Amino acid sequence: MEKYAVYVPRLIKKRENFSPGHRACIGCGEALALRLAFKALDNNVIVVNATGCMEIFTSQLPLSSWYLPWIHTLFENAAAVASGIEAGYKAMRRKGMPVPENTKVVAIGGDGATSDIGLQAISGALERGHDFTYICFDNEAYMNTGIQRSSATPFGAATTTSPAGKNSIGQFSWKKNMPEIAAAHNIPYVATACHSYPFDLMAKVKKAVDTKGPAYVHILSVCPTGWRSATDTVIRQGRLAVQTGMFPLYEVVNGQYKMSVDLPKLKPVKDYLKIQGRFRHLSDDIIRQIQDRVELEYQKLLEKAKNGIESKRTARKGK
């Protein structure tokens, strides 16, 4: 797949590393993103899966949706386990032991396992320079355990632990910017993606895994169950997230920012918010606050990409 053109579907391999027949909810954007991500890769991959939706709906014994070596970890230690696998292979090579050539290690987790519970292990693995890829499949709450808020839940969203009511607008804090946190570790590759832009997603995952050293990919994964939205609008919701600036698509390659989608003008965030039940309680004033915040953050991102503010930073290379 090294030379495939991401805009030519017929050149993509037919092989699937993630099978159908899993137990995801109807319209699950995470399952779609998962399939796309691993379809971009060959079969020389070891998958390290943090506890969460992906682990639950893909691996209930005696069944499995994985055609790859796969290990289930705790919520908090997927990056640590991935680090150990990578270091173990390195030690085996030093001792002259037989090791499969070009084996890749990919850790995956949801937004809770990434931005909250597993943040320390991820930060450590990125800082140490382990040669692995971490992919966050972000559905913006702890969906597996009952739609509880996480630090990746958007401002104003209603969840079971940030309910909307007379004295609450829902989520009270702004979404944690995990891609920027990853980029702050000066690693070679960081990217954002969404299943609604499938070939962009596949290209970025392939690029991340082929990068020498640590790489981080953050994928927005629409969750109709938790977002209280129609199951047939999953692709539309992902596109609107990008087109409104709520979830911009970009790469950070060796410190240099690059926008992935050219948007001459952002669509109003209301177009995105109004099709999700978790935002139906928001007043016009709160929506204006969200609009202002999105425009400010998007402009900052454009300036980084335009001026190469980050290009002078020296990215860490893999050990």
Which ranges hold each PLM region?
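Cofactor-binding active-site loop characterized by glycine-rich and histidine/acidic residues
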Residues: 2-134, 147-157, 171
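Conserved thiamine diphosphate
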Residues: 9-13, 101, 151-207
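Electropositive phosphate-/nucleotide-binding environments in soluble metabolic enzymes
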Residues: 15, 27-31, 75-79, 172, ...
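Short gly/pro/ser/thr-enriched loop/turn and capping motifs at secondary-structure boundaries
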Residues: 54-55, 139-144, 224-226
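Short, conserved beta-strand edge motifs with alternating hydrophobic and charged residues
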Residues: 136, 191-193, 216-220
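Short, surface-exposed, charged loop/turn segments at secondary-structure junctions
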Residues: 148-155, 198, 205-212, 229-240
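Active-site lining segments that contact anionic ligands and/or coordinate catalytic metals
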Residues: 212-214, 247
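Flexible, low-complexity linker and terminal segments
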Residues: 221-319
